[in-house]
From Swiss-Prot:
Bias type Pro residues, positions: 793-804
Composition-biased stretches (Basic and acidic residues): 504-514, 538-578, 603-612, 621-648, 692-701, 714-737
Region Disordered: start-end pairs: 131-152, 176-197, 221-358, 405-578, 603-658, 692-748, 778-807
Residues noted as binding Zn(2+) 1 in the record, renumbered to the chain: 868, 871, 891, 894
Subunit structure: Component of the TFIID basal transcription factor complex, composed of TATA-box-binding protein TBP, and a number of TBP-associated factors (TAFs), including TAF1, TAF2, TAF3, TAF4, TAF5, TAF6, TAF7, TAF8, TAF9, TAF10, TAF11, TAF12 and TAF13. Interacts with TAF10 via the histone fold. Interacts with TAF13, TBP, SAP130 and GCN5L2. Interacts with TBPL2.
Name recorded for this polypeptide: Transcription initiation factor TFIID subunit 3
Nucleus is among the record's keywords: yes
UniProt xrefs under Pfam families: Bromo_TP, PHD
N6-acetyllysine sites (modified residues): 266, 776
Annotated compartments: Nucleus
Stated family: Belongs to the TAF3 family.
Amino acid sequence: MCESYSRSLLRVSVAQICQALGWDSVQLSACHLLTDVLQRYLQQLGRGCHRYSELYGRTDPILDDVGEAFQLMGVSLHELEDYIHNIEPVTFPHQIPSFPVSKNNVLQFPQPGSKDAEERKEYIPDYLPPIVSSQEEEEEEQVPTDGGTSAEAMQVPLEEDDELEEEEIINDENFLGKRPLDSPEAEELPAMKRPRLLSTKGDTLDVVLLEAREPLSSINTQKIPPMLSPVHVQDSTDLAPPSPEPPMLAPVAKSQMPTAKPLETKSFTPKTKTKTSSPGQKTKSPKTAQSPAMVGSPIRSPKTVSKEKKSPGRSKSPKSPKSPKVTTHIPQTPVRPETPNRTPSATLSEKISKETIQVKQIQTPPDAGKLNSENQPKKAVVADKTIEASIDAVIARACAEREPDPFEFSSGSESEGDIFTSPKRISGPECTTPKASTSANNFTKSGSTPLPLSGGTSSSDNSWTMDASIDEVVRKAKLGTPSNMPPNFPYISSPSVSPPTPEPLHKVYEEKTKLPSSVEVKKKLKKELKTKMKKKEKQRDREREKDKNKDKSKEKDKVKEKEKDKETGRETKYPWKEFLKEEEADPYKFKIKEFEDVDPKVKLKDGLVRKEKEKHKDKKKDREKGKKDKDKREKEKVKDKGREDKMKAPAPPLVLPPKELALPLFSPATASRVPAMLPSLLPVLPEKLFEEKEKVKEKEKKKDKKEKKKKKEKEKEKKEKEREKEKREREKREKEKEKHKHEKIKVEPVALAPSPVIPRLTLRVGAGQDKIVISKVVPAPEAKPAPSQNRPKTPPPAPAPAPGPMLVSPAPVPLPLLAQAAAGPALLPSPGPAASGASAKAPVRSVVTETVSTYVIRDEWGNQIWICPGCNKPDDGSPMIGCDDCDDWYHWPCVGIMTAPPEEMQWFCPKCANKKKDKKHKKRKHRAH
């Protein structure tokens, strides 16, 4: 329904737009297409808006998101603004109701005006729904043991945790109930006492059991009435799972925490669900936490873990005012499925550090506390086994959870400076390093804005740190990598991982303070983790130092190499020329020797000083020698032009590895340039630059040059041969023309005297050969050749057209004659040049019968028209003479005839005259029209 309705509205809007643009009507198909385009466009725009809003942590787009979406689609906001100002807006014809109809909210969030709305903490963003009161949340948590994922359950734990945390901090009695988390210990016990408790508890698991830690769900239960029994605590842990992740973690958390949890539940039993249980609890939780710390965060010593957790200020630790806020979020995190796992990890972390334990207690449900109270003796003995089992479970869960969490790996292990990215960094060397502290601060800031996954950012952070630490410890134990990453792991476990980052700041500071105390902890896992972390840190430091040293050494080497190259270039400049004369094959040998002699080691301080002095001297020498060697260089340049070109190409790529650089840079041709090039090249060129490989390359280059030269020479020779052939052909043609002229002179002495164009007549003969080409070129419309074998003996005589036309016909045959013809006025006919090209290709005298048809055309009325091969003009009535052999008719002036020859005498055209000197022909045909 919605789609069809929206499409109908879009169709109306398309019609309105078309109407506004001046269209009176639109075809239905065009309207459908435009509607489809508009629909897709709006969908793309809306999709971009939502993606940008989600990218910036909002659920609904704002104008900024719309602007970003427009820019993404290539729409300029300034142009759009101008468009809106210049075009009148068209209002929709009728009012559009909001659709689809909104449905009732099933999430059961409290109304904004309810009592909980006033208790919204500063760190809770406004876009998050109101939080249920702590009592209501406790009731809800009791009911959902399965770890429901309702947003309500998620949110309720946050505020309840904060309230409970404050209560626990005030009352130590609550410590035995549900508030066995380490936040109370962290606040109440001084930093020194915590490490002691941790170390003592680390030694004895029983102490840890005493302060059983509540799973993350137990933190949620804190908001539930403090009177929750241990069983109730378990339920609350189940409730904490209401968030999707907690249910998976809950089983592991219960298995890991059962021994430690009974104590915690006892302390929690009163309203002490908050982590502010008595310091005794904290001490207990640290003990239990130590084993989990071993499992979950082997890298961190129990103390470090507690410090990290405290530092994050997960709101459960009374020490930091931020901790209460964090606790509020922590209850929400218990809702996440991972919270149960976090609970065991929380117990472990409590052993490690009281603050960490407090945070984790919130995460662990009262169940853990009950289990701890019941199983205190068992947990001391079984703590290690349970830890291992919990580790396995945590690992499995972490694997399952990590898949959805894009932040885990990216945020965690790989960048030391980024605490957000990986818990490993925080847990490991980074906790001690200022980077970790900075990252922790960043996390606290991010925590202030709760992530969508976690009801409260800090609470989710705590829960994440618990589960993440356990998962990380297990993973590290398997991989042998430090487990300090666990505190940041919450990010890995769920999308809310990023918000928990605020905790790391406190954790980093606390870890720094507690790290020495963690040394006291004797457990092997912790020690191994610490040693691993230290080793890693040392290795990183060493690598950094090495990198720095390498950079420094590289810079020094570059400077040295530059100086060396300059010196060697100057020293070897002239020797090169000598060597090249003697050994042109290996022009670089001298250079190689020079570089080998000058080693960076030898060229240290003394070398640098000497080099500078030598450079100045070399410069002077170069200037003096430069003048003398200009002549030599010019000669070499002429010889080595190819080399220089190649050398120039390698010189610019100074970036290439020195080994790859080609020696050609130092070729004799470029020897003069070498001093200028050396300073830039030296840093790039290593001592090994001049090796056999380079020699081979040089040889290959030389070969290539030689081959290229040979090819060029061959091409030149070919060209020269062709030119010579052309010249020969031209000479032959000229000779033939001269022969024709002589023959004509003998046959017709009259022609020579009247017109000086007789030599051109011979050219005409050549032109007459290719009648086809000439016919095409004939400028006169009648000049088109028509096949006809009949020819009147005397075409109608016409006034002599002047000797010019005669020149044109001969000109086509030889190129030089063409030039002469051009000088004369007879160049008018364009056929001349075309004929010349054709004549050059074809034999000079080749066609007898073809010529007949070529120069005879039939007009529209069927009359035959003869074309003069000499001038390529049709019969114009002027006197013409016909060749007794080829039947071509020439104007008298074109052939140099002034008076009619006797009829008994045969007359041959210039073409035939040469062919038939000694032959007798039929009667001469001569007619004057």
